């Protein structure tokens, strides 16, 4: 084989080795409906195996944002893939769909097989938690576009739901109970602000031991985004949900209204759930208001469910049976707008 391409910065052999290394991780995500294996021109999935009468496909794509820079700094790459999966499948399940399969896109400055394997391992871990198959992807070595130790990671997921069961939020009404599911921390949003406040301005490092966190700052920041697929599917199967919102960039103020029909709003009871200490640390070091925090971060709640009053106890029991802590954090109100009671300006 000619060395011309390698001399230009693209190592084909390293790419082949990376693919071979990732195969075992891909294989453990296999599920019913997947046709064929890794290496084809596209991934195939047989929808007829789901037994849906009027299937609706629900798709989502997302990335990990500048949380990747924390992974670069820590030289730890085996969990960032779960973040990519979580950001996609959580967006799908809030629409009532079961995630079926996932594809990843990884662009890097230099193909290092061990690093690529670690990244894909994290993707496969996320797929296993979500119950979806990793059926394909693209790994692109792009010298000159990225530095040798840099990469970007994005994901694409597709799910399916019976048309009649599509969760649109149109049936949410005043009086519905808002149930919050705890986050695992920052998840994958707000990291540009986090880096400025904690690393740049406060002078902390990823090795800083934070007593309030009980771990190093790096360990806290790289905690993977939580995947909520299985507990939500359990609630959906019983018809318990009127709506659901994945709390990502924009926090409570931007994400909860996305599930609401016109004519209603929400009132959140601040203090009705425990807020992880990472948010207090960011507030203290950055001099941020509570309004700033709720406009930017998930504040310890990664998923908000709207549940009819007469079903909320059953929903809480179902969530608990599926390993989820859950908190009643507020109500749907008859007046449009988002009110978080008890926070300062």
UniProtKB/Swiss-Prot annotation:
Keyword Nucleotide-binding annotated: yes
Main location (coarse class): cytoplasm
EC numbers: 6.3.3.1
Any one cellular-component term (Gene Ontology): cytosol
Record-linked InterPro entries: PurM-like_C_dom (IPR010918), PurM-like_C_sf (IPR036676), PurM-like_N (IPR016188), PurM-like_N_sf (IPR036921), PurM_cligase (IPR004733)
Keyword tags: ATP-binding, Cytoplasm, Ligase, Nucleotide-binding, Purine biosynthesis
Keyword Transmembrane: no
Pathway: Purine metabolism; IMP biosynthesis via de novo pathway; 5-amino-1-(5-phospho-D-ribosyl)imidazole from N(2)-formyl-N(1)-(5-phospho-D-ribosyl)glycinamide: step 2/2
Gene Ontology terms, MF aspect: ATP binding; phosphoribosylamine-glycine ligase activity; phosphoribosylformylglycinamidine cyclo-ligase activity
The reaction(s) this protein catalyses: 2-formamido-N(1)-(5-O-phospho-beta-D-ribosyl)acetamidine + ATP = 5-amino-1-(5-phospho-beta-D-ribosyl)imidazole + ADP + phosphate + H(+)
Subcellular location: Cytoplasm
Example of a GO biological process term: 'de novo' IMP biosynthetic process
Listed NCBIfam families: purM (TIGR00878)
Family the entry assigns: Belongs to the AIR synthase family.
Protein name, per record: Phosphoribosylformylglycinamidine cyclo-ligase
